[in-house]
């Protein structure tokens, strides 16, 4: 009997101890600092432990005012060559998944003549391809051959969710080809009134090689070119420039002969643009008569670092001529550079605002992003009244 009473007493004490520990843990959890959510509205999330990272965000506004966003995945466990499409019917506050598009990668959304298009490559280092949706992204055509959107070209091609431009009666998009260890700039264009799914309607420019001797030998490569329209002149391509070190620059490449040839003068066509060593989007605003972009500019306070991997600051800039750029606002910033990034902003004008989708590395309940590059979120961000007070809201931080 004595042993039974002792066991009973021990069980009661043990239960009381467990209850006390649970209450103590609950109290600690209640007072622990909550994990902050990334800025803006979350479209998609993939914890770092999945080894599936989210990239290549693109954004379009449908004729009825709804927003459509797309993105793809990368990383060791990521599904290959697949784009996910989401839609918002409430101006970006909430998002619903429309589905996945197989055999599509590094793609841009754009609207033309009431239809929604998705244009990129059919796989990483693949062939240019384009699809059309007549129901706002719920379903898509399939690029099976040259008459249905497979824009077959010899070689391997890279790109990103870069702007598709409508200008001079044509649709324009930039790509880069992988040739002899070089990324060569090129432009594809087609007449506005032709079937964009028919490869015969697309003109391809001559491929423009780069030269490692540029920028005193600091030039590495260029990529992710933006097609940009110019008033009273032919379109240009503004490319991201990767360098060994030094100030971040973009390359301004002119189109000639209705998109058949490209020209670039390294002595004058490298442009100082903070953040241009990472992917960016440039668009012209007829109201302000300025070109606008959102980049990962790097503050001076970061010191001497690899600028290409510093993505924790997002800055709004504009230019009257694509050559002289002014920083207006720091839109987002996090003090940590290694595991936080607001990057690959693709955006559209929406009245007095800019709306954007971002590839974001940020904190989550699973321990946060693996690195600033290996992003675990796709988010939506609204920049309100972007044209207002552009002269008085310059960042107080100097930019490299």
Region spans (language model):
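Alpha-helical scaffolding within the catalytic cores
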Residues: 278-279
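Bacterial N-terminal signal peptides that target proteins for export
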Residues: 2-17
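Beta-rich carbohydrate-recognition and catalytic domains
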Residues: 33-56, 60-106, 110-160, 165-224, ...
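Bacterial N-terminal signal peptides
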Residues: 14-27
């Amino acid at each position: 009997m004595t042993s039974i009473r002792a066991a009973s007493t021990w069980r009661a004490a043990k239960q009381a101890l467990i209850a006390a520990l649970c209450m103590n843990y609950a109290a600690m959890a209640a007072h622990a600092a909550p994990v902050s959510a990334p800025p803006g509205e979350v479209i998609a999330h993939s914890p770092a432990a999945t080894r599936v990272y989210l990239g290549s965000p693109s954004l379009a506004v449908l004729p009825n005012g709804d927003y459509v966003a797309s993105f793809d995945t990368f990383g060791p466990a990521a599904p290959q060559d697949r784009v996910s499409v989401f839609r918002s019917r409430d101006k970006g506050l909430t998002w619903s998944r429309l589905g996945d598009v197989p055999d599509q990668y590094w793609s841009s959304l754009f609207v033309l003549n009431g239809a929604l298009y998705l244009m990129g490559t059919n796989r990483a280092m693949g062939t240019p391809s384009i699809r059309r949706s007549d129901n706002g992204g719920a379903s898509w055509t399939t690029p099976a051959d040259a008459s249905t959107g497979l824009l077959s070209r010899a070689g391997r091609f890279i790109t990103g969710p870069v702007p598709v431009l409508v200008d001079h009666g044509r649709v324009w998009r930039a790509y880069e080809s992988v040739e002899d260890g070089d990324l060569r700039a090129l432009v594809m264009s087609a007449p506005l009134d032709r079937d964009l799914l028919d490869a015969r309607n697309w003109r391809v420019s001559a491929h423009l090689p780069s030269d490692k001797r540029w920028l005193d030998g600091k030039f590495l490569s260029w990529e992710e070119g933006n097609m940009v329209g110019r008033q009273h002149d032919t379109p240009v391509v503004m490319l991201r420039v990767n360098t060994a070190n030094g100030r971040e620059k973009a390359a301004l490449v002119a189109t000639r002969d209705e998109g058949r040839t490209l020209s670039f003068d390294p002595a004058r066509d490298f442009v100082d643009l903070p953040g241009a060593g990472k992917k960016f989007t440039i668009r012209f605003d007829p109201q302000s008569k300025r070109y606008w972009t959102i980049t990962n500019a790097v503050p001076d306070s970061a010191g001497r670092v690899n600028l290409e991997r510093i993505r924790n600051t997002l800055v709004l800039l504009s230019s009257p001529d694509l050559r002289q750029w002014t920083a207006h606002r720091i839109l987002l910033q996090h003090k940590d550079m290694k595991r936080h990034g607001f990057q690959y902003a693709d955006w559209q004008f929406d009245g007095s605002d800019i709306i954007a989708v971002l590839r974001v590395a940020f904190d989550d309940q699973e321990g946060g992003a693996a690195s600033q590059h290996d992003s675990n979120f796709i988010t939506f961000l609204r920049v309100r009244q972007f044209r207002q007070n552009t002269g008085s809201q310059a960042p107080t931080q100097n930019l490299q």
